[in-house]
Amino acid sequence: MRARSLSHTLLPAVFLATAGVWGCSPPAADPPEETAATSAAPPAERGGQETYGPYDLVDNWPKPLPDGPDGVAHAGWTWGSMGSVYAETPDRIWIAMRGELPLPEGAEPWTPYSMLRPPRRSTGNDDGRSATCEPVAPRGWERRYHHVIFVVDGDGNVVQHWAQHDALFDMTCGRGPHKIKMSPYDPDKHVWIIDDQLHVIYKFTYDGELVLTLGTKGQRGRDAGRLFDRPTDIAWLPDGTFFISDGYGGTRVAKFDKDGNFLMDWGQPPVDPKNPGPNEFNTVHSIAIGADRRLFVVDRAHGRFQIFDENGQFLDMFYTGPRGEGDDPGAPGIVSRPYSHLITVDQYLWVSDGGTDRILKYDLDGNYLYGWGGPGGWPGQFQGPHAMTVDQDGNLYTAEVFAGRVQKFRPTPGADPDKLVGQELRWSGSD
């Protein structure tokens, strides 16, 4: 099928957070009566805007990390790059953090790197190493692997910390976890964690016992289920069959049975990077499955989705934004960079776009429906929204790799339900 470009529907990625920070503009002419109030605002309110889309930002969430019984203190340290977040319930939110980062002298406690002056990027590999473990100029600060996997309650307080597994991610050329998830079809609620830099996929029991490792730690390649090349995400069918997006280097989707036995894979690098075809990938970054069993796969550096059946047959593709001036020599001309996506119970596709730093809604035919957000380091803005998740109360959580934070957004009273990210499919105990 032909690719459908949606470039004419993508809104500009310009976002003004607060007038007190960015300054004021001259007042605009009154809008037409039917558009004067947003759907998320009281009808009598004058002025204003959907600053955070149909949500209110929850301030000071999560709470600062506690000093641990292991003697690790947090004075002078702050949040690291946030690889992923998963809302099991409104009172159990799992966070995968790529280690804690040191604060420069004089910085306020728990200042995210995006809000330092000058700001810093929280992501990165071992100091002085590239993503492929080659020597590069050191940036001058380094993480420590503490609070890598932890759980917070609805108020943002830490209620669980897998301290016993912090060291699992501490290896030369590593950078910490890329994704944390639970299968919606698993009554035992196993926790899956993907470490892209170390090329492994871990499966844990709910209380933290490691029961399965796919891949060979620290070794990259493409060899069935024995070697991966920076895997990124996982998705399941109801019978437990699962698919791995592999990944930054692997240019493939790999299929496994419920016991972790390799079944097949598909995908290859583009023959012509300027004109990639079906089944050709540059950074297979996220994967989700619709109720009709179609696989929606993020081809990130090509700025698009590719859609397959469960046996790897290509079905369709569409782009998530304009093809303008890009900064990736492997995919010139792409502006949009879809980072992660959900297919909600009501069968819509929600995307966090790291190129435009927006949250986007599509139908499953690829038609653009709505979007909000924009780039910046201040609260409510985004710098690399790498993962998103929704709890049963409709709260939206985002994890940012460049800003070094997880943010919580609560639905605004009276918000248009069509603008709210819908429910994720999850194990309910009644299926």
How should each PLM-predicted stretch be described?
Residues 31-431:
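Eukaryotic scaffold repeat domains enriched in small/polar residues
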Residues 20-23:
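C-terminal motif of bacterial Sec signal peptides marking the signal peptidase cleavage site
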Residues 25-27:
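Bacterial signal peptide processing site
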Residues 1-11:
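Bacterial N-terminal signal peptides that target proteins for export
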